[in-house]
Amino acid sequence: MPHSNYETPEVILQYFAPNQDGTPPDANDLEIQYGTKNLHLAAVTLNDLRPDKDKITLTDHGLQLINHDTAMSYEDFNDPEKIKSQYYLEVAEAIKKATGAQKVICFNHNVRSEAAPRLDISKHKVDHIGPMRRVHVDVAPRGTYEAVEKRAGEALMSSIRGRWKIINSWKPLKTVQRDPLAIATGPSCPDEDLVELTRYRPDGSLSESRYSVLYDQRHKWYWVPMQKPNEMLLFNQYSDDPNRTLADRVAHCGFTLPGAEDKEIRESVEVRALVIY
């Protein structure tokens, strides 16, 4: 299918493939999350989010496209402290406006400016400076302590139990020409498609727990063709609400857009936020 009009291209996404013998995957093996192990390549059709901008919402679908003009310059995003002191406040206000939340605390970010993540297999480390191409959800329930609760503190977390979410914001620093972001609606991805991958430190303590995703033809994928710096994607990653829905965690990934492999490398900023209701 031609990609010049960017309407509904068919692309290949990197899903999870279970071990053939039924044994659980070793999530400490970074090749499983970032490399070629346990890899299932599947063709999916992408839907342009812009025409459905007013219909696709965080509440019902788990993602939302909003307009956001930042006061940050392009160069400012090279300064981690300025991102924390200025851009975090902008993101917090944008999420408040979109959700009606009482309070938003931004707690970490990734600026991606290379073609792929850097892996150090021997040290079990990854630098998140390139697109994450595996279909995933950032946080599984067992990972919430490491992801947010440890940072926010026991006193705060006890006071907001059942009233908080993790929401990510994502926007490009330049118009996206390659390796865009794709997000699947939460209701189209049932729980049985999620595979928990939990990593541990050498001392046995939990490092992170996230979901990888099995292919399912029911998944409904969206993207924003040639996404501009003033177009911000918000998407849910976890909810502590006991009545949480499928829209409270959405699968997402970067992907290769056929014909755009030699375009300018994508530069983007993603901020993760604790959202309190």
Curated annotation (Swiss-Prot):
The keyword Lyase does not apply. Phomoidrides A and B (also known as CP-225,917 and CP-263,114) are potent inhibitors of Ras farnesyltransferase and squalene synthase. CP-225,917 and CP-263,114 inhibit Ras farnesyl transferase from rat brain with IC(50) values of 6 uM and 20 uoM, respectively. CP-225,917 inhibits squalene synthase with an IC(50) value of 43 uM and CP-263,114 with an IC(50) of 160 uM. Alpha-ketoglutarate-dependent dioxygenase; part of the gene cluster that mediates the biosynthesis of the antihypercholesterolemic agents phomoidrides which are dimeric anhydrides. Within the pathway, tstK is responsible for the iterative oxidation necessary to convert prephomoidride to phomoidride A. The pathway begins with the highly reducing polyketide synthase tstiA that catalyzes the formation of a C12-fatty acyl-ACP, starting from one acetate and 5 malonate units. The hydrolase tstM is involved in the release of the C12-fatty acyl chain from phiA. It catalyses: 2-[(1R,8S,14R,15R)-11-hydroxy-14,15-bis[(6E)-oct-6-en-1-yl]-3,5,9-trioxo-4,10-dioxatetracyclo[9.4.0.0(2,6).0(8,12)]pentadeca-2(6),12-dien-8-yl]acetate + 3 2-oxoglutarate + 3 O2 = phomoidride A + 3 succinate + 3 CO2 + H2O. One of its GO terms (molecular function) is oxidoreductase activity. This is Alpha-ketoglutarate-dependent dioxygenase tstK. It comes from the Eukaryota. The keyword Membrane does not apply. It is an enzyme of class 1 (oxidoreductase). Its EC number is 1.-.-.-. Keywords: Oxidoreductase.
